[in-house]
Amino acid sequence: MASPGLPQPPTEDAAWPLRLLHAPPGLLRLDPTGGALLLLVLAALLGWSWLWRLPERGIPPGPAPWPVVGNFGFVLLPRFLRRKSWPYRRARNGGMNASGQGVQLLLADLGRVYGNIFSFLIGHYLVVVLNDFHSVREALVQQAEVFSDRPRVPLTSIMTKGKGIVFAHYGPVWRQQRKFSHSTLRHFGLGKLSLEPKIIEEFRYVKEEMQKHGDAPFNPFPIVNNAVSNIICSLCFGRRFDYTNSEFKQMLNFMSRALEVCLNTQLLLVNICSWLYYLPFGPFKELRQIEKDLTLFLKKIIKDHRESLDVENPQDFIDMYLLHVEEEKKNNSNSGFDEDYLFYIIGDLFIAGTDTTTNSLLWCLLYMSLHPNIQEKIHEEIARVIGADRAPSLTDKAQMPYTEATIMEVQRLSTVVPLSIPHMTSEKTVLQGFTIPKGTIILPNLWSVHRDPAIWEKPNDFYPDRFLDDQGQLIKKETFIPFGIGKRVCMGEQLAKMELFLMFVSLMQSFTFVLPKDSKPILTGKYGLTLAPHPFNIIISKR
């Protein structure tokens, strides 16, 4: 038996640092070149960490970063250690759950520690979060020319080539493309009564599909998603699709797969090491295949439109864009209008226009099922203003303040685009006393704005009356910004408002919605490109 006064060798289950100290000398021996290289790497990492810990003059405060990967280092940790890293620690009240959901909650919590404007690092990219309305407005409205660019990060650049509307860089080309796109969509009814019949027609198919379920519980997502996607199809392709159409189902599958894969945490590492995108396995390979499938699908549609184009009678957005391309070729050899740009704009319209509106409608159905008393008030307002037989119209909005207030309250609580789309500064500036360097990524936390107790009384309660005055008339609040603000405000805002009102009122006019017995829906939302409700079932009864 060994003397109790002598140190004992560690057991196999001892901590690895203890085992390392007792390792045989030969195990740790390095040749001079290897030792020098190891020391050089350690010195570089420590030096990098030390430099970043030095508070650059005026930069917003924030958590200390890791070497090389910044504050994104927790992704590299084993799952059991992630909860102890900075993103998983609850700051004060609220917080995010252990499954990693609730990025908007996390950033709101960190704002309570570091202030409404704080910073962190993803790799070498400086990210600044804006958690309150005043900082968001000052940045995106009062300093719009500086804060309206998009981040030049590898993953976005690879996927979009800097084209389209949503992720394109701010400048003359973007302004031309957005102006043309917006005016063309208006030509085909965006924000006008002329689009109303298409939305009401689409609801007939929604109603038909829902009635097939009788009094059995069903997931409303596929039906609502099909309807919203078809309205975009009407604007872009000049036609709607039957829900069983193989081409339509293929397109929705491509979009769904693209959104799902893009949310894989490993893909975010591409922004640190861009060559990872070309790895021949895992989500990297799958994303490249999805990109290829979507490209073939949309370019075939554009090709078909080009071959059948009637110059005297353009039928949809693609026709109008192709005509404009030809005009620009004659008048402007350096025009930014081409079929490649059209491809990315169509992708933007579908991804941005479908996902957001679909999830907003699903949140509406969920909240109505949870609050039958509010649902009953809406039924009463519909009966009083519209009746049981006439289809709703946008002209009814002014006479239906409670219904409109309810939609707004759902949008406030759900905030389906909680962090907007990231912005980037095009030059160095000062925001509320903080220095914001050129190229800084800006995250406007719209979710935090909509839950700010300094603005909203009992912000976590569902209370539509907060949008009504003493006479029951609608109040427009400047702090209500579900579509963002500034030069990058959502281009499809008018379409989304039309769809939400007409579809929601049509659903409420036709059905009463309840949750299955003992159902306990989760209201935290499922974070992705948008904040979607967790899958839920509902039961309808015809009114």
UniProtKB/Swiss-Prot annotation:
<feature type="transmembrane region" description="Helical">
    <location>
        <begin position="342"/>
        <end position="362"/>
    </location>
</feature>
<dbReference type="GO" id="GO:0008395">
    <property type="term" value="F:steroid hydroxylase activity"/>
</dbReference>
<dbReference type="InterPro" id="IPR050182">
    <property type="entry name" value="Cytochrome_P450_fam2"/>
</dbReference>
<keyword id="KW-0492">Microsome</keyword>
<dbReference type="GO" id="GO:0006629">
    <property type="term" value="P:lipid metabolic process"/>
</dbReference>
<keyword id="KW-0408">Iron</keyword>
<keyword id="KW-0349">Heme</keyword>
<keyword id="KW-0443">Lipid metabolism</keyword>
<dbReference type="InterPro" id="IPR036396">
    <property type="entry name" value="Cyt_P450_sf"/>
</dbReference>
<dbReference type="GO" id="GO:0005506">
    <property type="term" value="F:iron ion binding"/>
</dbReference>
<comment type="function">
    <text>A cytochrome P450 monooxygenase involved in the metabolism of arachidonic acid and its conjugates. Mechanistically, uses molecular oxygen inserting one oxygen atom into a substrate, and reducing the second into a water molecule, with two electrons provided by NADPH via cytochrome P450 reductase (CPR; NADPH-ferrihemoprotein reductase). Acts as an omega and omega-1 hydroxylase for arachidonic acid and possibly for other long chain fatty acids. May modulate the arachidonic acid signaling pathway and play a role in other fatty acid signaling processes.</text>
</comment>
<feature type="transmembrane region" description="Helical">
    <location>
        <begin position="32"/>
        <end position="52"/>
    </location>
</feature>
<dbReference type="InterPro" id="IPR002401">
    <property type="entry name" value="Cyt_P450_E_grp-I"/>
</dbReference>
<dbReference type="GO" id="GO:0006082">
    <property type="term" value="P:organic acid metabolic process"/>
</dbReference>
<dbReference type="GO" id="GO:0043231">
    <property type="term" value="C:intracellular membrane-bounded organelle"/>
</dbReference>
<keyword id="KW-0999">Mitochondrion inner membrane</keyword>
<feature type="transmembrane region" description="Helical">
    <location>
        <begin position="495"/>
        <end position="515"/>
    </location>
</feature>
<keyword id="KW-0812">Transmembrane</keyword>
<comment type="similarity">
    <text>Belongs to the cytochrome P450 family.</text>
</comment>
<dbReference type="InterPro" id="IPR008069">
    <property type="entry name" value="Cyt_P450_E_grp-I_CYP2D-like"/>
</dbReference>
<dbReference type="InterPro" id="IPR017972">
    <property type="entry name" value="Cyt_P450_CS"/>
</dbReference>
<keyword id="KW-0256">Endoplasmic reticulum</keyword>
<dbReference type="GO" id="GO:0005789">
    <property type="term" value="C:endoplasmic reticulum membrane"/>
</dbReference>
<dbReference type="GO" id="GO:0102033">
    <property type="term" value="F:long-chain fatty acid omega-hydroxylase activity"/>
</dbReference>
<dbReference type="GO" id="GO:0005743">
    <property type="term" value="C:mitochondrial inner membrane"/>
</dbReference>
<dbReference type="GO" id="GO:0006805">
    <property type="term" value="P:xenobiotic metabolic process"/>
</dbReference>
<dbReference type="GO" id="GO:0005737">
    <property type="term" value="C:cytoplasm"/>
</dbReference>
<protein>
    <recommendedName>
        <fullName>Cytochrome P450 2U1</fullName>
        <ecNumber>1.14.14.80</ecNumber>
    </recommendedName>
</protein>
<dbReference type="InterPro" id="IPR001128">
    <property type="entry name" value="Cyt_P450"/>
</dbReference>
<keyword id="KW-0496">Mitochondrion</keyword>
<dbReference type="GO" id="GO:0016712">
    <property type="term" value="F:oxidoreductase activity, acting on paired donors, with incorporation or reduction of molecular oxygen, reduced flavin or flavoprotein as one donor, and incorporation of one atom of oxygen"/>
</dbReference>
<dbReference type="Pfam" id="PF00067">
    <property type="entry name" value="p450"/>
</dbReference>
<feature type="transmembrane region" description="Helical">
    <location>
        <begin position="58"/>
        <end position="78"/>
    </location>
</feature>
<feature type="binding site" description="axial binding residue">
    <location>
        <position position="490"/>
    </location>
    <ligand>
        <name>heme</name>
    </ligand>
</feature>
<keyword id="KW-0503">Monooxygenase</keyword>
<keyword id="KW-0472">Membrane</keyword>
<dbReference type="GO" id="GO:0052869">
    <property type="term" value="F:arachidonate omega-hydroxylase activity"/>
</dbReference>
<feature type="transmembrane region" description="Helical">
    <location>
        <begin position="261"/>
        <end position="281"/>
    </location>
</feature>
<dbReference type="GO" id="GO:0020037">
    <property type="term" value="F:heme binding"/>
</dbReference>
<keyword id="KW-1133">Transmembrane helix</keyword>
<keyword id="KW-0479">Metal-binding</keyword>
<keyword id="KW-0560">Oxidoreductase</keyword>
